[in-house]
Structure formats: structure tokens, C-alpha cells
Amino acid sequence: MDDFTGLLARDFGLKPQGKSAPMASQSNSSAADFNTFASSYSFASAAGKKSDSLPVFDDLGRDGDDLLFRDVFSGPPPKYGSSGDSRSPSAPAFDYDVMFKEPKSKSASSMPVYDKPVYDDEDVFESIPELKIPSTSSQSARFENVFSSISSSPTKHRKQNSSPFDDLMGNNLGKKESDREEKGSSIFDDLIPGFGRTSSPPAKRTTSETTSQSQKPPYRTAETSSNVKEDPFVVLEESTSTLREPSTGGFTDPLEEIGKFNSRKTDHSSVHGGVFVDTDPLDSLGKSGPDMNSRGKSHLRPPGNISGSQSPVESSGLYHSKNVSFDDVVEPQNTSTPPPTNSDGSFESSDDVWLTVSEIPLFTQPTSAPPPTRPPPPRPTRPIKKKVNEPSIPTSAYHSHVPSSGRASVNSPTASQMDELDDFSIGRNQTAANGYPDPSSGEDSDVFSTAAASAAAMKDAMDKAEAKFRHAKERREKESLKASRSREGDHTENYDSRERELREKQVRLDRERAEREAEMEKTQAREREEREREQKRIERERERLLARQAVERATREARERAATEAHAKVQRAAVGKVTDARERAERAAVQRAHAEARERAAAGAREKAEKAAAEARERANAEVREKEAKVRAERAAVERAAAEARGRAAAQAKAKQQQENNNDLDSFFNSVSRPSSVPRQRTNPPDPFQDSWNKGGSFESSRPSSRVPSGPTENLRKASSATNIVDDLSSIFGAPASQSGGFQDVDGETEERRRARLERHQRTQERAAKALAEKNERDLQVQREQAEKDRIGGTLDVEIRRWGAGKEGNLRALLSTLQYVLWPECGWQPVSLTDLITGASVKKVYRKATLCIHPDKVQQKGANLQQKYIAEKVFDMLKEAWNKFNSEELF
């Protein structure tokens, strides 16, 4: 931050008239200087509150300090004593402990004990003869003015350390120290008539005066000698109070005092010459101070004045102070922008706010340590709404930090503290007295949004300031002529010097205004260029971002498409695999179903065949048993019949023997004529059982058995006549035995021989029955197999025909697809068509197939009926194809 050294001289052309700036040597003691400045600048209006003289205006209360400081730091500061005691230079001039506490009782001293004000007996209007008022002892203790070093006499300026504003005007307004010492006048003797004399502290103003200043004279009669004039730089201490309290001091103009003292009994309109009757450029001043934010910075900042000096700031209808005439705003207060005049010769009402140090309170404890040397950060500006039909100066023009040529040398700690104080004061409460809220507190605008408007508003403000300055100059000339008649001669020279300084100041202001405008234009051009560059950079970044996003989007889409295609391929492959597996599974299931069906059919056929064989065996066994029983019954019957026949034959033989005995003589005599070896021809008696036996045909052995008794018959023929009878009997009994075909007992046969012959006969019968049963079983089995083949042929023929469709006579096709019709257990290995190109390979594969599916081979391997049927059919088809192949191809 910049210090105050030379700041007014650089920006406004004001230079002190006293000795050379004593502040230059006190740059290190910045804290003490700032405290002195704050105390002198804030509480100058309260210096004469306890004087015996009456205030200029109607006070709202006897204790005006409470009203003045009730909103500021929680109560009024303690007052000076009337005695001329002075504090040590090391003690701070601003008692913060007292300011931040609640106000105390009336009886106790509530004002802080400041350093003894310098040049208490000097008046800012000392050079005006008519306003020179003798000061009493009660008026000696006053608050130190901000420009005490300017307004005080050079002699006193040497005696005591001045305020930090000694060097504020820059080499004492450009005048030499010798000139100031010779003239011995105040700093503003040549600037404004009467602006250098010692005056009493500012007096309070009534509420009526704040509302209608044009109807009442701003000052009372001459009897209020102690409170006739106010310090022109303490005007904004009245704006520190809000609507809750009236303003505590009147803001008067030295030029206005000139006219008022020349014609005290005249009307207010006659004093102003009918020009400024209804015009109050500071109409809203004193009603409300700017809002303070958390950092103590206001939204308003004086234009071109970083040192914290007074300057008009547009409040846009939010700062409605008490009605003060145009004379209250004068150039000794560094007003570089006077309001312009309208067409009818009167000034327009202005909402300019005069910021003073009294409105810049400190919330930090004072310290003697130097502040940090780093520059402050730039503050964002906030536009303020304009009042309707009133010209305004945007605050952005005041907030802009305009660089100047003299800024480089202003870097002392005192200026840094004052800049912080200025920033802190800008953030105060901006709620107007009429209840309008601060428009800047609720809206945020861009830093560069009001740059163009700021330049135009600044130019308008400069034009108004020029018009105001010219009018003030004319008024001062007229008032000075009136006042010069009753003034002393030495004031004329001071007035001329002030006029010269005023003209020089005007020239400097014009030059500085032109420089500021040029710098502002350059700054605006730079800002526009920076904004354009920033906009271009943002556009380029946006284009790059869009291009990058497009590339990323295209890449992402390509990746998504590739992933989708890969996923689709994988899905298709998986579906193909699943389909193949399903088809294979279906084929295997069909084959298994066919095999199971074939097995079930074979098992059923086998069961049926076994059942039929068992039934056939049972039937055969039953028949054999029946036949054997019948044979045994017949044999028993034959034996009984034979026994009966033998009995009858024996009886007949006996009868015949007796008869033959009677004829022995005949046989005796006839024996010589017929040899005994020739048997006699006899007629054998018929056997009643012979026909039935031969008709049965059950025994084939009946034929050979019929020849058995031939032997004994022949023997009987050869025997003698005695033996012939026996032979005849044997033949009689042997004939039936040979005729029966069963086992017959032979007379004279031993028991062993008879048993052996019976066993042999039984074995023969058993073998014959067994052979017959086997033959019958084979025939039955063949019949069952044929029936089963006929049954399963309906199912298997369909598959075989489907397999051989289109392959009739094509041996290669049949051999390459043979695995689809054969069962897995046959041992056939699939063969590809590429292996069946040559005739030799076809012949070789055909031989293998023949060995695998030949019906006899299949029968030997224990195949079932279904497999046998398939083998027979396939073998027949292969044989036909082989015959065709063998006839067509040579190999």
C-alpha cells in the first residue's frame, strides 16, 4: 500500500504551506502517525462539545458524543481536558480499548486522552477578517485536524510533531519554506478565503436542518462564536451515524461562511444569490455510512485518492445525508470532481459521499512494528445502481487502481496502514437512511463489466468538477470582495496567494485528470486486450476440448463396436459349438435309443424264445412221459396176455400130448420113412396181441425181436421127436415175444443176461426220445427267430433304407458311411472317402467290412437278433455293390 507522502500533491495538487514536511522523517513510526491521523480526522467535530458557547445548530441532546459514536465502536471516545497537557510521542493517539467498549456513564470521562492537538488556536478561516473569532480558553482543547499541519501557522508547525498529513500535499503545495515562514499564514490562506484560521470544533445540526437546509440559515448569529465553522475535512463523520441517531456535526463550507458572515440577518436564498437555493450536492451525506464487511472494506473508494483523503463518491441514491448546500463542498477538501451546473444555472443534486478518516475505524490493536511491505491484493468492484435522472459516477472507476508516475516513491508503512484503513472503511454498512438496501451487497459482477462505463462516468465527473470549481471560484471572488472591506490588509496578500495556488491547482488537476484519463484508457485497452486474449484462449481450449472429446468419443465408439463384434463372434462360436454338441448329443441319443430299442427287442425276443423253448421242452417231456406210461401199460397188458396164452398153450399141450401118446405107434412106424431133421409143417396159432402191437408202430425193435424165437424153433426141428414138442412150445411162446417189439423175457435166460438186455433196450429208447426232442426244439427255435425278424424288420428296414438311399451300388459311399448304421460294439472304424480313391483301397476296406459284418462272424461273436438282422441286410447290400464295382472297375 502507498503512504500519504505526496499523495495529494500528486493527485490533487495540494501542497502544505508550512515548513518542509516533517512527516518524511517519521516514515518509520507509521503506527503512531496513523493513530494521530485517525484521531484528528475522526473526532475533530467533537473538540468543542464542552465549551460554554452554544452550538451552531440545534443539538438533539446535550451529550452529543453518545449520538455521534453510538454506532461507531460502541460509544464515544474520551474527551480532552481543557488543560494543555500533551502525551508522550510513544503513546498511541487512538485509544482502541475505549472505542471497542460500551459507552460509560455521563459523569465519567468517556473520551480518550489523545495527544495534545497541535495548533489548537489556529482556525481554518483565520485568513478571513470577518470570521476571525477570538477563542477562549475552553476552546483551546480541540481534536487535531487531519490537515493541522496545513492549516496551522508555521511557527507552531516547527514546535511539535505534525500529523501524518504534513507531507500529504507534497512539499507544502509547492511553496518554498521561506515563503511560508515570511507570510506566516495557514496552508489554505491563498486557496480559499478564510480557510486557515482557527475555528471552533464543528457543531451539531438539528434534524430540521438535515431535512430542509434551504429554509434555515446553516449557522446562527454571531453570538455562537465558538461553533461558527466546522472543519471542512470532518464532513463524513456525520455519515458514520445511521438512521438510529441524527448526525452529530454540521458540514460547513468556508466559502459559505463568508457569505453568511457578510449578511447574517439575510435570508439563505439571498446569501446564495438565488442560485443554490434548492441544490444540495451532498443531499444524502450524513444519513448513512457505507456498510462494513468482515474485513472492514467498503464497496466505495474515492477516485484517484488512495491515501484516504476526502473525495466524492457516488452512492447511487443509497447515501442520503443531511441537506448541505453547495458551499459545503469546496476545493480545500481535495474535491477534484465538482458537480456540473444545469441549464437554469443551478447545480443538480449529487449523491457524492465524502469519505473521511473518521469513517475508517481500526479493529486491530495499534503497534509500532512496521506493516508488511507486500502490496495489497486488488479488490473486486461492484456496480452501484444509479438514481433516476441523476448523473452518477460508477464505483468501478474509483476502485480501479490507476498507476501514476509518482506511485513508485510512495511505499512507506504509513501509507500501507492508511490503504488498509481505506479498504476497511469501504466495507461499512451501506444501508441508507430511507431504508433502501445496498444493491452492491447482493449482486456480483465481473471486474471488467463496467470498464467502459467507468471511463464515461469519470469524464462526466471531471466535467462536473470543472463546472463546480469555476462556480466556486466566481463565488469565492465575489465573497472575497465583500469580505475584503472589513478585513485587515495582511489578509489580502494571503487571499492573492490562495488564488494563485488555486489556479495552479486547477492547472495541475487538469493535467492530472488528462493523465488519469489517458492511463485509464490505456488500462481499459489493456484490459480489453487481456479479455480478448483470455476469450480467445478460452475458445481455443474449448475447441481443443471439443476435439479431444470427439476423438475420445470416436475411439470409445470404435472400441465399443469392436467389443460388440468380438462378443457377437464369441456368441456365434459358442452357439455353433453348442449346436454341434447338441447335434452330436442328439445323434448319440438317437443311436442310444435305437440300440436300447434293439436291445429291448432282442431281449424280448430272447425271452419269448426261451419261454417258447421251455414250453416246448415241457410239452416234449410230457409227451415222452405219456408215451412211456403207455408203453408200460401196453407191456403189462402184453405180459398178462402172454401169461394167459402160455397157460392155455400148456393146457392144449397136455391135451395134445395125450392124444399123441395114442398115436405113438403111428409115429413109431412112420419115423423110418421121414427124417427127423426136417421139421414138420405146423400152423402156429394166431396171437391175439400181434396185430395190435404191429399196428401201434411204437417200437421198431419188434422186427428183430421176431427173429429171436427162430433159433429155438430150428433147434426143435433138428431134435428128436421128444424135443420137437418142446420146440413147438418154444415157438408158440416165442412168436408173440418177437411180435410185441418190447422187452421180452426169454425162457431159460439167466437173470444177468436178461438185466443187461433190458438196460440196453432202455438206453436205446432214451436216445431216440432225446434226438426227437432236440429236433423239435430246433424247429421251434427257427420258427421263433423268423417271427422276431419279421417283427423288428419293420423298424430296422426304415433305418437301413434311409442309410442306403442314393448309395445303391456305390461301394465307396456305403463303406464311408458304414459307421452310421452299425452298432458301436461291432468294431468297425470309420473310413474317409479320400482313403477310397483307388480300387485296391476299396477292395481292402471291403474285405475288412466283410469280416466285420458277416452273419456267421456276428453269430460267433454272440450278437443279438437285431444285430444279426442288421448284419445280414448290410452284408447283402455290400455284396451287391461289390459285384457291381468288380464288374465296372479294373484293379
Swiss-Prot record:
Residues 826-891 form the J domain. One of its GO terms (biological process) is negative regulation of growth. Residues 174-184, 460-538, 555-568, 579-647, 751-764 have a biased composition (Basic and acidic residues). Residues 606-627 form the R domain. This is Auxilin-related protein 2. It comes from Arabidopsis thaliana (Mouse-ear cress). It comes from the Eukaryota. Residues 368-381 have a biased composition (Pro residues).
